[in-house]
Amino acid sequence: LNTRFIKGVGKTTRSILAEHGIFSVDELAKADIDQLLKIPGVGKSKANRMISAAKYMVGEMTRVNVVSSESIPAHGDQAEKEIDLSSGYYYINQELSLLEFNRRVLEQAKDERTPLLERLNFLCISCSNMDEFFEVMAAGLIQRAELGATRAQADHLTPQETLAAICERAHGLVHEQYRILNQVMLPLLEAEDIRFLRRSQWSSSQRTWLKKYFQEQLLPILSPIGLDPAHPFPRILNKSLNFIISLAGKDAFGREIDLAILQAPRSLPRIIQLPKRETRSGEYDFVFLSSIIHEFVGELFHGVKVKDLYQFRVTRNSEMYLDEEEIDDLLRALEGELSSRNYGDEVRIEVAENCPDDIIEYLLGQFGLTQERLYKVNGPVNLSRVREVYDLIDRPDLKYVPFTATSPSGLGGGWNIFETIKKRDILLHHPYESFAPVIELIRQAGDDPDVVAIKQTLYRTGANSPIVEALLRAAKAGKEVTVVVELRARFDERDNISLATRLQEAGVQVVYGIVGYKTHGKMLLILRREGKHLRYYTHLGTGNYHPKTARLYTDYGLLSSDQELGEDVRKVFVQLTSLGKVGKLNKLLQAPFTLHQALLKKIERETLHAKQGLPAKIIIKVNAVAEPKLIRALYRASMAGVQIKLIVRGICCLRPGLEGISENIEVRSVIGRFLEHSRVYFFENAGQPEYFAASADFLPRNMFRRVEACFPILQKKMVDRLRDDLTLYLKDNSQAWILQTDGTYVRTHPEGQSIIEAQSVLLEKLTG
């Protein structure tokens, strides 16, 4: 029985399986769980794991020529020569890995340790994540499949095979979302006097109030379209709420009418809160917009009988396709493309669970979709907008305990930040430490008569950003302000176009980066005249210059007066604005030029050190790992004995736990109150450890199609801090999930141990 790659299946288990008539992976894949439970020493968890892994192996071996596991030596150069590490077997599918991440987010909605309204928020986030999955990843796969593309990813699955694989997984996730809503969240909320009322639950006075609301707030806005040759099926906006209405009777012109479409404008709230006079004291009563429309839609069709109506929502391809080599003005070209996003190719359709088959078939036909792209839902078709109630409910006991982010001494509004940074570099850890010092630095730069220039990159910064206000203020004060605005930040394009225009009108020099490359690095450079010299002050970060997300995402930011580092950043800005070549950088590693090769060399150095018996260890904390060459380098390092710890929030295509290949690699994902967003790289380097922070994940796009910045952390206090933080994340036994060989994740459980939750420890340690 070739089960060597199945974690937990050794020679003894193989012999026992053979005694029970299971001699091959195929037979194990087809085994019934009850059959395995009869085997001594095999519990439910192990049985499920063995069957799942066997099924995966059977599927993979039909697609790729997997090297026989029996021929793989445990370690050494000969092993590397005989193993084809480019085989698809060694890579987890990227799309399936992303769906696994969304499953982990959804699990937070079921975690009883999390406050109830935060659990509701996690449910909504999982829905929003699924929307983006379909708009981008699934849409891209569908497009490639329809074009007949056969080029496989690192896992050797073609677009067609990947689509088939994600179909069942995605349907299961959506079904679980609505099960949690209806069977878990709504009953728990009702027990806390927070109710989402169905039409059958409305009292007489509530119904009167809602009818008046419909007549005054909705009726004048809604515009139903009766379907006939003169009124064809309308264009449906991406992710909009729509109703298909079944009618009987004749319209005002005496014609038979049987179907109509009603689109709910996005300006309308999806949830309406009943006034306090219509609820009992201390209660919160909400009604879905769809319920109100369902109840009173007849008022839109006088003289025609409304037989029924069913909500539906279409998700479309939201990628924008620009031939950047052929356009003269990127901003204007993007403006022209933005409107088309609402009408991209259809990817999926969600319909009410009770929608009849004939109407479903009609809708599928209108959008050119198949049954595989159909998702029946028992509830509102857009769960993500349920989060609107969060701010309407004044129940601190059902939310996370608020905290006050702190600032290191010398960085407050009453201090001269330049003098503070001149004395020492400062590492900020958001959201535990405030983002305010970064904003204050730009403000002081605008007011300081010795500051002559400010250069900054902006990828996402949000509406009404104090960063932007500070830059505008500096420009008005006569400073030379240059801003590299990345117009192509997905789903923020419109905001960034508006931002760029506003900055230009104020006299800021605005550039849009490099054609073909997104500017994703987070860089701020301030040039200050001190005596006869210009001095550099820099800020480099792992996250965006976005004050709102700085309160929700974990990120690091470095404030430094290191002149070599500042000169590196200056050169990068010259490269971005003038398109000219620059000399070799001193300390900064930059994608798409030096970062990928530098990482490969550092991993190879650890591999060599392990073979020489020297201390060798790698810790990588990123959002995603999918770049094949980096994964292969990590495999080779593991085979040489390097201990590798990966803290990867989302996608991870590396397959850990393969005997002789990746058994020295552990992959964990931490999902908690804050979105883990920081990128940190650690290399043991034979006892001379190196730490880096960066804007780049281990993805092909970050290495080759984006401008990224990776910067060293050198001062001992900051090095010690990063070491302690990484150690804490590796000890987390509460919010951490461990990646299994088969691509699934198992949550850590502190059995008999003290609970260690990294984010909570950092909150207690760093905040007020």
Question: Which residues does each predicted region cover?
Answer:
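Compact, charge-rich alpha-helical regulatory domains located at protein termini
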Residues: 1-68
